[in-house]
Amino acid sequence: MAPFVHCSTGRPGRFTDGSYGIYYAGDSEEVAVAETIHHHQKFMSSTPQPPGWTSDFRVLVGSVDRALDDVNAVPDVLHPHDYTASQVEGHGLRGAGSDGLLWNSARMPGQRCIGIFWPNAITIPVQGRHYCYHWNGTRVDFVRQYDTGAVLAVT
C-alpha cells in the first residue's frame, strides 16, 4: 500500500507527477536494484549527506495477473532522465482505467519494468533480500546483501 498512500508531488516518478502513487517493479531483482540505485543517487546528490552506508532497501516479491499497457513504442517515454512524456502517458492511461504499464528498463537494457496504478492489481508482496547502499559522495558505489554479507561493487 505504501506507494499508493505515500505519494508526493515533491517525489514524482517516471509515470506520475506525484499526485497519485504507482507501485514500480522490475522483472528481476537485478533490475529492481539497478533502478533503485539510480533514483537513490539522484536523491542523495541533492542532499549534504556525507559518504557512508546510507540507506536500506528491501526486495518485495509479488506477481501481477493483469493486462498491462506496453508503452515501449510511445515517443519519449523511455528517456532516461526527462519524464515529461512518460508522466503525460501515465496520467492518461490511469485516467482511462488501465491497471498499469510495462516498459524496457532505462537502467538495464533488455530487462523490463512495470508500474501498477491500483493496489488490487498486484498480489500482496513478500519480502525478499535486504540491501544496504553505500554512497561515496558522488554515487552509489557498493551494495551489501544483509543475508549473505556480500559487498558488491556497482559499475
Q: Predicted segment positions?
A:
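Active-site and NAD+-binding cores of ADP-ribose-processing enzymes
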Residues: M1-T16, H38-T155
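A short, exposed loop/beta-hairpin motif centered on an aromatic-Gly-Thr core
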Residues: Y20-G26
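Generic detector of short, well-ordered, non-transmembrane alpha-helical segments enriched
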Residues: D27-S28, G97
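Alpha-helical transmembrane segments with an aromatic anchor "belt"
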Residues: S28-E29, H39
